[in-house]
């Protein structure tokens, strides 16, 4: 099975949720390790190097937000947050500090499984064809985007992007000057079709994160622009240099 080598760390202080997810994810071919609190999660992460982390928000001592912040200091590992918080602003807090996606409790295990597959697909090192040659370096002013190594440089310094952030940037750059709707971005980058009713603010938060990392003035961007009434577009003219 294609997922056998993928290792997932499940972090939740509820033993029942850990057991359910460990059982379900093991059945569909993942290797699963678990942690019951944030401090344990960081220890296990640094020992096991999982392919993805499923991270509960509400935990004693070090909560999911704190774990996410610590992980982002040292890793681009995909993170899916589990949140029981009702307010939308609470749900997207994890995205703002570096998570790739979130699922609201109570959740369907099948829904979480689908999101895990989608996030892992996009975090894969194999570059999909989005209209930009994967053997080239894209030069846009002070930016260089290596579509083969999935790396970005700003003023010749490496900028750390998560897998989802890179895929979003790659999509926008693939058709520079053409606007993408939030719905189309969700489908192309996250694999979510419109009937799944995913909150489009997932896109907005990731755009904000990209701007913060790539723009000289994130509040007045000149690379990643907002297309009013539509979504977003990448502005600059691209010069393609073959590797």
Swiss-Prot record:
Any one GO BP annotation for this protein: regulation of DNA-templated transcription
UniProt-listed SMART domains: REC, Trans_reg_C
Primary location recorded for the protein, binned into one broad class: plastid
PROSITE patterns: OMPR_PHOB, RESPONSE_REGULATORY
Residues annotated to bind DNA: 76-94, 135-236
Residue ranges occupied by any Response regulatory domain in the UniProt entry: 7-120
A GO-annotated cellular component: protein-DNA complex
Top-level division of the source organism's lineage: Eukaryota
Subcellular location: Plastid, Chloroplast
Keyword Magnesium: no
Keyword Iron part of the UniProt annotation: no
Pfam families per UniProt: Response_reg, Trans_reg_C
GO molecular function, one term: transcription cis-regulatory region binding
Keywords tagged on the record: Chloroplast, DNA-binding, Phosphoprotein, Plastid, Transcription, Transcription regulation, Two-component regulatory system
4-aspartylphosphate modifications at: 56
Protein purpose: Probable promoter-specific protein mediating the interaction between DNA and RNA polymerase.
NCBIfam families recorded: ResRegRpaBCyano (NF045944)
Protein name: Probable transcriptional regulator ycf27
Organism whose genome encodes this protein: Porphyra purpurea (Red seaweed)
Gene: ycf27
